Regions:
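Sec-dependent bacterial lipoprotein signal peptides
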Residues: 1-23
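Extracellular/secretory-pathway and virion-surface proteins
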Residues: 25-537
Length: 537
């Protein structure tokens, strides 16, 4: 966010000092040295509310009042939640039914079987299935002393080329030395009618399997020890479209959490909001009715360990979600929304907890009224059920020590043994047009985030002056100072990082103050430093 860049100037004071005061080349060790006092302007910058929060979150009304608008997904359920087509194999065996041998002529169709294959899809009762991905493997295990041609015909299926069958062959084999072959068919785009041969079943595919001796061969003597095994293997099936009855069951979502980045830069302090709105939206891309029972929606602040549960009538009863509309080549999802605000909930307390996570738990009832579509539930590969949150927070607020924090590593010239900066005083000239005072802190921390030392900052940036309408009518000027001792400079050069914090407090703690897009703070930073000339050896 932009605030990292602007408040980063504060964090980089010391690094910038050293950069500006560094002299070019290393001096000879016998050169004379002397110290001088220098006054150097370092930084001049300005920032608005768009530099304190991500610009993409900021909207304004015609009066310039700032509103934060944050959108986030709460949860999402996709196709594999409702339909998972497992790998499935069907095996067919032929053996001579008598303890004798028979001489079959070339081209003889010695094995033929009509069958219905039933797929195990648990609660789902599908009538139509169109595949996006998948393959069909026809495997043959031959112990007959002739090349054998095997055929798998699927009257209930239509391949993309319009065909319904696949054929493969396997070389001659014997009981002691069988031969094998595998043919593979890409099933992408294949449509299956799963109503069976009488069109009154579900999850059922009509199948015909056959095998004949090579028409160009010599025929074969077949004994009771000879056999042929054919297997049809459906692998890696991913539906593009499915229609049927998807069952009546409950799917649990959560308990789980999602990250919330709205308050990422805030580490402490309190926030009191005048108004806030949360819009809960649900989009159903599945062709079945849903009933949602919200169990919990929580604002979790992992920094403080505090959790605030949202209270609203939405938790008292089910939410009924209509099914999507099937267009034949796509779908129109159904939409649901509910507006939660300070008049019907504790949304203000929910957000004032400054959450960095949202916790949720809910139950999804599929087809709560049963098969009211008469087996016409549907889904597409692109179907999903998703719930989202839209937070709208007009910046009419009271803050007390609401603290932004950044950590940075200064890019210092030279090294701990070869720098010439001895000490200095930083001055920050602030012209503040916000209705909030700003208190600055600078800490030196180690690689683990533990504080080593503090750079003391004296003074605060006073809040702008309020008029009768509680808007800033005049900006105020303040001067802050920070002493950089020789010890602090040495700590910086020893590898410490800078943690800068800015704590904002509204000037009126009894009324919610509006933040306008036009409010601005101007900053100028100067350095009065003691520098050892020829001392950077």
């Amino acid at each position: 966010m932009k605030n990292v860049r602007h408040w980063g100037w504060v964090a980089f004071w010391t690094g910038t000092i050293c950069s500006l005061l560094s002299v070019g080349c290393r001096k000879e060790s016998d050169r004379p040295t002397w110290d001088v006092d220098l006054l150097v302007p370092l930084v001049r910058t300005s920032f608005t509310i768009r530099d304190l929060v991500a610009d993409s979150l900021v909207t304004t009304d015609p009066q310039g009042t700032v509103t934060l608008l944050y959108r986030s997904d709460l949860f999402k359920l996709e196709l594999d939640t409702l339909l998972l087509a497992p790998d499935t194999s069907f095996t067919y065996r032929y053996a001579l039914p008598i303890a004798d041998s028979l001489n079959f002529p070339a081209g003889f169709n010695f094995f033929s079987q009509n069958d219905v294959q039933r797929f195990d899809l648990e609660e789902l009762a599908l009538r139509t299935l169109v595949l996006r991905e998948g393959r069909l493997e026809l495997r043959m295990d031959n112990r007959v002393n002739s090349l054998v041609i095997g055929t798998l015909d699927l009257p209930g299926a239509i391949f993309p080329n319009g065909g319904t069958s696949m054929t493969t062959s396997v070389g001659a084999g014997t009981p002691s030395n069988p031969t094998y072959s595998t043919a593979v068919r890409d099933l992408a785009g294949t449509s299956f009618d799963l109503r069976g041969p009488q069109f009154n079943a579900v999850n059922t595919l009509e199948t015909s399997i056959g095998a004949m001796l090579d028409p160009a061969g010599q025929g074969a003597w077949v004994t009771a020890d000879d056999s042929l095994v054919l297997s049809a293997n459906y692998l890696g099936l991913v539906p593009q479209y499915a229609r049927g009855y998807f069952g009546q069951r409950t799917v649990e979502a959560g308990p789980d959490t999602n990250d919330l980045s709205l308050f990422d830069a805030l580490v402490s302090g309190t926030l009191d909001l005048d108004v806030a709105t949360l819009r809960l939206t649900v989009e159903n891309g599945f062709g079945l009715d849903l009933q949602v029972r919200m169990r919990q929606l929580s604002a979790i602040n992992t920094r403080t360990g505090n959790t605030v549960d949202l209270t609203h009538t939405i938790f008292q009863g089910p939410i009924n979600i209509n099914r999507a509309i099937d267009l034949g080549s796509g779908f129109i999802p159904s939409q649901y929304s509910n507006t939660i605000d300070v008049s019907n909930s504790n949304i203000d307390l929910f957000l004032e907890n400054l959450p960095d996570q949202i916790g949720y738990e809910l139950d999804l009832g599929l087809n709560p009224l049963g098969d009211i579509s008469s087996g016409n539930d549907f889904l597409y590969y692109e179907s999903e059920l998703k719930a989202g949150l839209e937070l709208e927070v007009p910046l009419r607020l009271i803050t007390n020590e609401l603290t932004l924090q950044t950590v940075s590593t200064p890019d210092l010239p030279r090294n701990a043994e070869g720098h010439a900066l001895r000490s200095g005083e930083l001055k920050l000239f602030a012209t503040n047009g916000f209705p909030m005072s700003a208190r600055f802190e600078l800490d030196l921390i180690d690689a683990n985030g533990e504080m080593i030392a503090t750079i003391p900052v004296d003074g605060i940036a006073a809040a702008g002056l309020l008029g009768a309408n509680n808007l800033v009518t005049a900006r105020t000027e303040s001067v802050l100072t920070a002493e950089l001792s020789e010890e602090l400079v040495n700590i910086l050069y020893a590898g410490a990082r800078l943690r800068s914090s800015v704590a904002f407090t509204t000037s009126d703690q009894s009324q919610h103050l509006r933040i306008l897009d036009s409010y601005r703070m101007d900053l100028q930073i100067t350095l009065a430093a003691n520098y050892m000339v020829n001392g950077d050896e």
